[in-house]
Amino acid sequence: PGFEHYRFDLIYIDGDHTEEAVFNDGLSAFMVCRVGGYILFDDYEWREETKRGIDRFISVHANQINIIKKGYQVLVQKTSN
């Protein structure tokens, strides 16, 4: 059992900092984030690998999110499925 039947207003991502893990965490979060909800990525400016994973997520979902803040943390709002 997982979270696939739930929808969340805010999801905070601060786990494995490899590019692939951050990207996959973003994809998983996007699936369970409600439209209008937020995904917050930590450590964007900490390691290049982490930054690449977050940038990949943003690129894939560019038409479905708004970037609210981009600094040490990145906050995006989901605008559509």
Put a short name on every predicted segment.
Residues 16:
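Switch II (G3) loop of P-loop NTPases
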Residues 2-11:
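A short acidic, Gly/Pro-enriched loop at the edge of an enzyme's catalytic core
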Residues 19-81:
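C-terminal substrate-binding/active-site "lid" region of AdoMet-derived donor-dependent transferases
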Residues 10-13, 39-40:
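Short beta-strand-to-loop acidic/aromatic patch adjacent to the donor-nucleotide binding site
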